Design a protein with these regions (language model features):
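Acidic/His- and Gly-rich active-site-bordering loop/insert found
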Residues: 1-95, 116-121, 303, 332, ...
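Metal-dependent amide/peptide-bond hydrolase catalytic core
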Residues: 13, 42, 167, 174-372
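Acidic-glycine-rich active-site phosphate/pyrophosphate-binding loop
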Residues: 74-88, 151-152, 167-178, 303, ...
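Phosphate-handling active-site elements
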Residues: 88-90, 110-126, 151, 206-216, ...
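Glycine/serine-rich anion-binding loops at beta->alpha junctions
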Residues: 91-105, 185
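Acidic/histidine-rich catalytic neighborhood of metal-dependent amide-processing enzymes
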Residues: 100-174
Length: 372
């Protein structure tokens, strides 16, 4: 399995541009002698999903194993070659090591072992490697719109959870705000309408609207002003400004209702400041995720973890979004996140993964698929 991981880490799928078709082809070939159905779903521009299925004895209630094929860009600050896997002190270093080609290798290796065992599972086991998770989620959307979720009861996504049982994930809204005010001399700010001040003030109002309440696995919702631009000159009050906010929501939050409240707050601010105009647009919308407490697979994973490793499996939640939020727009199913990677190392220089954690994740996944 570690050899498989090494080979996948050496395939460049930085997004942009993605080029996931290369890795999808590799996985398709890896399963070529495996007794399973397999296909490639082309989504254009050198990008593709790869899907495989082990047919079960009974229809419905399929288990889907999911992982994304792309990685974020390498970035600077590396002490190793990010596109060449390097083993050191029991860890593998490369872009995608934690997020999430290690999880991809675990699910792929366990899937092929299960297919080659000749033991037919009770229900279908589906493997889905998706493109573009790190950007727009187009791969997951294409997979869902092709009807490939129609018989799926549970999706196990091999995102980095440090071997924890991921039962919840924050939702995400990227909100673009644009303000038009009135310029004037910087010495007489009272004569103008400061667009930058208006957007920073709105950001505070949004933060108050979003926050409040906590989740046992996720903590608090957050609203962070991450980008702002505006102004022409240091001695001129800016009449134009644009900002971006990263909003992370908790399970139970309806994004449509939340955006409606934010628009109302912006309208109230404009009413209180004649001449001010504010425009809002949603750039990314990923719903929060929470696994049902009585999920059969979640309960069985906990039991197997204790049996295999003689310790309880920790429950965890993730602040980042995944393809789970896309899938749940199309199917009412349970989503569990589990993988050997560490979320703290995702998207960082010198990203790495523990080889021991990969082997433990494989043992658990292998045991789970024997009972699927």
């Amino acid at each position: 399995m570690i050899r498989l991981l090494n080979e996948m880490l050496n395939i460049d799928t930085q997004n942009p541009p993605g080029n996931e078709r290369i890795l999808a082809d590799y996985i398709f070939r890896y399963l070529s002698e495996c007794p399973c159905e397999r296909s490639l779903q082309d989504i254009g521009n050198g990008r593709a999903n790869v899907i495989a299925r082990i047919k079960g004895r009974e229809p419905g209630r399929a288990l889907m194993l999911n992982g994304h094929l792309d990685t974020v860009p390498n970035g600077a600050g590396w002490h190793t070659d990010p596109q060449r896997a390097e083993e050191k002190d029991g860890r593998l270093y490369a872009r995608g090591a934690s997020d999430m080609k290690s999880g991809l290798a675990v699910m792929l290796f366990a899937f092929r072992e299960t297919a080659e065992s000749g033991i037919r599972p009770a229900h279908d086991i589906v493997l889905a490697g998706t493109a573009d998770e790190e950007s727009g989620g187009f791969g997951a959307r294409a997979l869902a719109e092709a009807g490939l979720l129609k018989d799926v009861e549970t999706i196990l996504i091999f995102e980095p959870t440090d071997l924890g049982l991921g039962l919840a994930a924050k939702g995400c809204l990227w909100l673009r705000t644009q303000a038009s005010g009135k310029t004037c001399h910087g010495a007489y700010p009272e004569r103008g309408i400061n667009a930058i001040d208006s957007l920073t003030g709105l950001a505070g109002i949004i933060r108050e609207t979003v926050t409040g309440g906590t989740h046992p696995l996720l903590g608090q919702a957050t609203a962070t002003l991450t980008q702002i631009a505006g102004g022409l000159k240091v001695n001129m009050v800016p009449d134009r400004a644009e900002a971006m906010m990263d909003i992370r929501t908790l399970p139970g939050t309806d994004h449509q209702t939340l955006v409606r409240k934010i628009r109302q707050k912006a309208e109230e601010l404009c009413t209180a400041t004649p001449g001010l105009e504010i425009r809002l647009s949603v750039e990314n919308n990923r719903r929060p995720v929470e696994t049902r407490r009585r999920s059969v697979y979640a309960q069985r994973m906990e039991q197997l973890y204790r049996e295999l490793f003689n310790e309880p499996m920790k429950h965890t939640g993730t602040a980042f979004f995944s393809d789970a939020s896309v899938f749940l727009n199309y199917a009412d199913c349970d989503v569990i996140q589990f993988g050997p990677g560490e979320s703290a190392l995702a998207h960082t220089p010198d990203e790495s993964v523990s080889i021991e954690a990969c082997e433990k994740a494989l043992r658990l996944t292998r045991a789970l698929l024997k009972e699927a």
